[in-house]
Amino acid sequence: MRGRRGDRMTINIQEHMAINVCPGPIRPIRQISDYFPRGPGPEGGGGGGGEAPAHLVPLALAPPAALLGATTPEDGAEVDSYDSDDATALGTLEFDLLYDRASCTLHCSILRAKGLKPMDFNGLADPYVKLHLLPGACKANKLKTKTQRNTLNPVWNEDLTYSGITDDDITHKVLRIAVCDEDKLSHNEFIGEIRVPLRRLKPSQKKHFNICLERQVPLASPSSMSAALRGISCYLKELEQAEQGQGLLEERGRILLSLSYSSRRRGLLVGILRCAHLAAMDVNGYSDPYVKTYLRPDVDKKSKHKTCVKKKTLNPEFNEEFFYEIELSTLATKTLEVTVWDYDIGKSNDFIGGVSLGPGARGEARKHWSDCLQQPDAALERWHTLTSELPPAAGALSSA
């Protein structure tokens, strides 16, 4: 800044900040709380009740629910404890969960959603709900509702059921519930999801949820990826220690078996009832499963039994029964091998999974076998996990 020609003038920072300031009354500085609507405060409470003036709530900072006109929970509805808000930009989902320990089933009642995010050009969506048990990646592990057309407040009232659910699943698994928008011309779009640890459920007690949908949260950085990998590594080590040095086996589905030793017929009755969540072995995303059983040691190689083939399914029902003539004292030294196969025409059949029951088995498989020996003439049904471990003698018989 210059005064007379050739003279240079200097100004301090206070004078610089005062230049070009419009005259007028001094306005109060806005507080952060002024940008959010406030309900009436408690009677006699300080801080001032009522809502902030409308001109102090910029549209960009308004709560997303205010833009979508989301509603509040219905009076008397039982809301889960970690439901903090009933209105988000993604919407809310209402559902019930019930774990039936007696039948080893998890019942999922998908009720309704409210205030979903618009996904189509008409400002609406074609929503459906997809369920997935984690960890687990097979197609049979996924269940879905029907699609509701052109709505942001869909009502489903559908019951989806997982079979073969054990107490171990309830302890370790998580139910992922995703709401998606169906698009016939392109890929379906993800709207939001909810993840419920099954350990929050109590047997035979229905639990009601009304929860805000959340976005998928990716790992933010390589450092978080490293932390996640370290956590997975520790988890796997704990599992390995729990298995007392045994290798970790891939889960390939579940099978429901019935065992009964008949005192009258002097033999073992093996019931192959059904399978659930089998691994898909064919390119169409399904399998053509059948079940084989062996009672080993099998010196005469006459103990093989085989069910019929069920086409294009990951949840087959067999309801077939096989009989092994054997004394109870001899049965105590035997091992029952049960394997599930995918039938292929003109080539070797694919091994899906298997389980062994006998004195050398572990966990539920051993308990089922010992209960059968200790309770003659009682039909005992149990679910068993199929693993990727192929019995040594079964590999040579895969085409049988």
Curated annotation (Swiss-Prot):
Chain segments carrying region Interaction with UNC13D and DYNLT1: 1-89
Disulfide bonds: none
Tissue and organ expression note: Predominantly expressed in brain. Also expressed in testis.
Cofactors that this protein relies on: Ca(2+)
A Pfam family annotated for this UniProt entry: C2
Region (Interaction with UNC13D): 215-400
Any one biological process term the GO annotation gives: chemical synaptic transmission
UniProt binding sites for Ca(2+) 1: 120, 126, 181, 183
Annotated residues for binding of Ca(2+) 3: 282, 342, 344, 350
One example GO MF annotation: calcium-dependent phospholipid binding
Compartments, as annotated in UniProt: Lysosome; Cytoplasmic vesicle, Secretory vesicle, Synaptic vesicle membrane; Synapse, Synaptosome
Membrane topology: Peripheral membrane protein
Chain residues that bind Ca(2+) 2: 282, 288, 342, 344
Entry's Gene Ontology cellular component terms: extrinsic component of synaptic vesicle membrane; glutamatergic synapse; lysosome; neuron projection; synapse
C2 domain ranges (all copies): 89-211, 251-384
Keywords noted in UniProt: Calcium, Calcium/phospholipid-binding, Cytoplasmic vesicle, Exocytosis, Lysosome, Membrane, Metal-binding, Repeat, Synapse, Synaptosome
The keyword ATP-binding belongs to this UniProt entry's keyword annotation: no
Free-text note on domains in this protein's UniProt record: C2 domain 1 is involved in binding calcium and phospholipids.
Reported function: Calcium sensor which most probably regulates fusion of vesicles with membranes. Binds calcium and phospholipids. May be involved in calcium dependent neurotransmitter release through the interaction with UNC13A. May be involved in calcium-dependent spontaneous release of neurotransmitter in absence of action potentials in neuronal cells. Regulates Ca(2+)-dependent secretory lysosome exocytosis in mast cells.
Assembly, per entry: Interacts (via N-terminus) with UNC13A. Interacts with cytoplasmic dynein light chain DYNLT1. Interacts with UNC13D.
Protein name: Double C2-like domain-containing protein alpha
Lineage: Eukaryota, Metazoa, Chordata, Craniata, Vertebrata
Gene that specifies this protein: DOC2A
